[in-house]
UniProtKB/Swiss-Prot annotation:
Catalyzes the dehydration of the S-form of NAD(P)HX at the expense of ADP, which is converted to AMP. Together with NAD(P)HX epimerase, which catalyzes the epimerization of the S- and R-forms, the enzyme allows the repair of both epimers of NAD(P)HX, a damaged form of NAD(P)H that is a result of enzymatic or heat-dependent hydration. Its EC number is 4.2.1.136. Homotetramer. The gene is nnrD1. This is ADP-dependent (S)-NAD(P)H-hydrate dehydratase. NCBIfam families: yjeF_cterm. AMP binds at residues 202-206, 231. (6S)-NADPHX binds at residues 53, 113, 165, 232.
Length: 296
């Protein structure tokens, strides 16, 4: 049974106004579409004990309309034969999935780990898929902060998106969280300049910077997003939009906005801020995307 979401007239007006910035996201689907029309996303992560992270990202990608989604786990064998509640998601080991050539976009790092196997998988993806959009989050960012070879490979990606929280940003810059937070705009621009990437600096009023230093300040969201797995969901949302062909900067900005706006919808509909589960975000984002598209 689908949750019942709603928005007040003023909230709806404000969200519709913001959505005008994201024309590729809120475009109605053609009636003759098929699953291949909406791309294939690969989510790579899930070391032992962290199998839930890629599941959150992959399920979010499905909710946001991706045609097909793979989840790859950095383990010798798959942690489960099928994901309970999400049989639509295809499963593979991380090293095997990294070799596929039919992937339209990648999300790498959700619970990946930072050991030798993780570094090798990340390096392989960055080497073999330089022409595809690649979102790096969590442990993938931690590897970049310590491994010079992988850092150089990342710079060679044409459509790279980094999604650090302040601590990950500090590690990438070799500085402190306090210094990042003292000037978030400078931090997000510097990371973008170092990697030639679009950067999503998460936190209150998430910042998105393009490689040419255009800055988007996200105004959506609330404290309910301060929950484990929220960042994995954001990565899955952005990856889903990329796989569907949304331009990189628009996908990053719209993903950040939808992620926050979904939490706002949940708060307005059910009064939930404290105790919001990460897995509850994407269904609200799906509802919002469809509601806005219908209204455009």
């Amino acid at each position: 049974m689908f949750p019942v979401f709603h928005l007040s007239g003023e909230s709806r007006r404000q969200m519709l106004q913001t959505a005008l910035r994201f024309p590729h996201v809120f475009k109605a689907r053609a009636e003759d579409s098929h699953k291949g029309t909406f791309g294939t996303l690969a989510v790579v992560g899930g070391s032992a004990g962290m199998s839930g992270a890629p599941v959150l990202a992959a399920s979010a990608a499905m909710y946001l309309g991706c045609g097909k989604v793979w989840a790859g786990f950095n383990q010798d064998t798959l942690p489960f034969a099928v994901i309970a509640g999400f049989p639509e998601i295809m499963l593979d080991t991380a090293d095997s999935l990294a070799k596929r050539q039919d992937i339209n976009a990648w999300v790498v790092g959700c619970g990946l780990g930072t050991g030798r196997a993780a570094v090798g998988t990340l390096a392989g993806i960055l080497t073999e898929h330089t022409d595809k959009p690649v979102v790096l989050d969590a442990d993938a960012l931690n590897i970049l902060s310590t491994d010079a070879e992988t850092r150089n490979l990342a710079r060679g990606c044409k459509n790279l998106i980094l999604t650090p929280h302040p601590a990950e940003a500090a590690r990438l810059l070799g500085t402190t969280v306090a210094q990042v937070q003292a000037d978030r705009t400078a931090a997000v621009r510097k990371i973008g300049a170092i990697f030639g990437a679009t950067v999503v600096l998460k936190g209150h009023k998430t910042l998105v910077a393009s490689p040419d230093t255009e800055i988007y300040v996200n105004e959506s969201g609330n404290a309910g997003l301060a929950t484990a797995g929220s960042g994995d969901v954001l990565g899955g949302i952005i990856g889903s939009l990329l796989a569907q062909g949304v331009p990189v900067f628009e996908a990053a900005c719209a993903g950040a906005w939808l992620h926050g706006a979904a939490a706002d919808v949940i708060k307005e509909s059910a009064g939930i801020a404290a105790g919001l589960l990460a897995g509850e975000i994407a269904p609200a984002a799906r509802w919002l995307r469809n509601r806005i598209t219908k209204s455009m």
